[in-house]
């Protein structure tokens, strides 16, 4: 299982890198598109579609595998109180995985409302999963000191992701207020792949990329968890 986690994380990181550099090498503005913006440009959309399809396809079986190994661990460690959190964590990340596959074929400039719904399911599901996984690892460390390092590392990545989420929210709010609508002319700007036109939007995009990297970090802690549970 730990090998599958490594493969999933590597694919996710490679996808982000290839999407960004394909965007830049095509002459687009380097600072900074939203991740989904790279799906609007033929030079980078192929990497977005292939990479996130594979990421989502690996996320779903991993959610099932981690649910099962954690369930078995809980059965052997009565009183750990992770059963409900384990189920909710598995469901939330599985839904995110399904939405990641779906959004790979839903460019936002073609199906805006559907794309935004998918994005909220992805990020909402990943936030729930990261928080619950962090609490689960804390409960594990309370029963078995070997999980202490895992708990600390996972907590650090989760906190980093939440800080990035806060930065994303503040940046978007400073530009658009409470409105969730896309600013007029923004689509044309993205399709021309030039500067987003406002520092707050580029800063929000930077926080989005950073948050996704943070989630990849949380995912990678699954390698250590799988090894510890198997021991």
Protein language model annotation of sequence segments:
Residues 187-192:
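Surface-exposed intrinsically disordered loops and tails
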Residues 71-83, 111, 142-153:
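Membrane-interface helix-boundary motifs at transmembrane edges
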């Amino acid at each position: 299982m730990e090998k599958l986690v490594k493969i999933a994380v590597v694919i996710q990181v490679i996808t982000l890198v290839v999407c960004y550099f394909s965007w830049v090498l095509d002459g687009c503005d380097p600072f900074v598109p939203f991740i989904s913006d790279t799906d609007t440009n033929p030079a980078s959309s192929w990497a977005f579609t292939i990479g996130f399809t594979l990421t989502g396809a690996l996320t779903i079986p991993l959610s099932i595998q981690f649910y099962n190994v954690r369930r078995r661990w809980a059965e052997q460690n009565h009183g750990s109180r992770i059963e409900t959190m384990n189920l909710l964590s598995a469901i939330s990340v599985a839904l995110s995985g399904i939405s990641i596959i779906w959004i790979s074929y839903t460019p936002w400039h073609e199906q805006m409302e559907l794309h935004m719904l998918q994005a909220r399911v992805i990020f909402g599901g990943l936030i729930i999963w990261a928080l619950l996984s962090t609490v689960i690892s804390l409960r594990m460390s309370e029963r078995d000191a070997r999980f202490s390092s895992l708990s600390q590392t996972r907590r650090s990545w989760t906190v980093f992701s939440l800080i990035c989420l806060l930065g994303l929210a503040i940046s978007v709010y400073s530009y658009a207020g409470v409105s969730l609508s896309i600013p007029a002319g923004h689509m044309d700007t993205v399709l021309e792949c030039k500067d987003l036109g406002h520092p707050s939007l580029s800063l929000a995009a930077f926080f989005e990329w950073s948050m996704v990297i943070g989630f990849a970090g949380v995912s990678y802690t699954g390698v250590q968890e799988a090894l510890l549970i198997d021991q």
